[in-house]
Amino acid sequence: MKTIAVIGLGKFGFYVAKSLSRLDVKVIAVDNDEKKVHEISEFIDDAYIVDSMSKQALQEVGIYNLDTVIVSIGENIEASILTVMALKDLNNNTKNILENSQV
């Protein structure tokens, strides 16, 4: 089974994670907002409250060496950039880091 991480559970990230879970994809969902993580946990098993800018935190929840990671942090461009940088440092084998921000 393919595993995809979704970082950021705003409108876009929430629906991407939910849709992927319906396609028999293992989803690891991450956000720093407890309410958003609780909402998505109704649809997927691996949902975590995490500071996505922390390499150590991402590694602890299993976000390393994945083929695809989707970053959907929204309007906080700094957090989005720092998250992508942490992923690049952490995931030497990651083939796709998809980023969706609103600027």
Q: Where would I find each of the regions flagged by the language model?
A:
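Cytosolic regulatory regions of ion transport systems
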Residues: 1-103
